[in-house]
UniProtKB/Swiss-Prot annotation:
The lineage of its organism: Bacteria, Pseudomonadati, Thermodesulfobacteriota, Desulfovibrionia, Desulfovibrionales. GO terms for molecular function: rRNA binding; structural constituent of ribosome; tRNA binding. It comes from Solidesulfovibrio magneticus (strain ATCC 700980 / DSM 13731 / RS-1). Belongs to the universal ribosomal protein uS12 family. With S4 and S5 plays an important role in translational accuracy. Interacts with and stabilizes bases of the 16S rRNA that are involved in tRNA selection in the A site and with the mRNA backbone. Located at the interface of the 30S and 50S subunits, it traverses the body of the 30S subunit contacting proteins on the other side and probably holding the rRNA structure together. The combined cluster of proteins S8, S12 and S17 appears to hold together the shoulder and platform of the 30S subunit. Part of the 30S ribosomal subunit. Contacts proteins S8 and S17. May interact with IF1 in the 30S initiation complex. GO terms for cellular component: small ribosomal subunit. It holds the Pfam family Ribosom_S12_S23. Signal peptide: none annotated. The gene is rpsL. The keyword 4Fe-4S does not apply. This is Small ribosomal subunit protein uS12.
Length: 123
């Protein structure tokens, strides 16, 4: 336990908070190129084939990001925009691909939560 004089001489070291999305480097979104598009299985107790992509960002960092929504048009060399946001049942997936921007198409026949999936308003 330090004395008050010791604290005046040298203050306590600040404990820095761990960043949840370090690859974004404090930006809201980042652009990148898909290097691999594949499916993976979630951890227990869930069961599915989740669509994910390995993305090399413009800052040179390569991350795994989730492709939300039903169906997608992504393949290798597709240019995508990613945002933060993890997928709880996929270890190591801390980013989401934004639908409806750059090479990523919006989800077709989407009626609700359209803005989150880049879907236009149905006529």
């Amino acid at each position: 336990m330090p004395t008050i004089n010791q604290l005046i001489r040298k203050e306590r070291a600040k404990v820095s908070k761990r960043r949840k999305t370090p690859a974004l480097q404090a930006c809201p979104q980042r652009r990148g190129v898909c290097t691999r598009v594949y499916t993976t299985t979630p951890k227990k107790p869930n069961s599915a084939l989740r669509k994910v992509a390995r993305v090399r960002l413009t800052n040179g960092i390569e991350v795994t990001s989730y492709i939300p929504g039903e169906g997608h048009n992504l393949q290798e060399h597709s240019v995508v925009m990613i945002r933060g946001g993890r997928v709880k049942d996929l270890p190591g997936v801390r980013y989401h691909i934004i639908r409806g921007t750059l090479d990523t198409s919006g989800v077709s026949d989407r009626r609700q939560s359209r803005s989150k999936y880049g879907a236009k308003r149905p006529k």
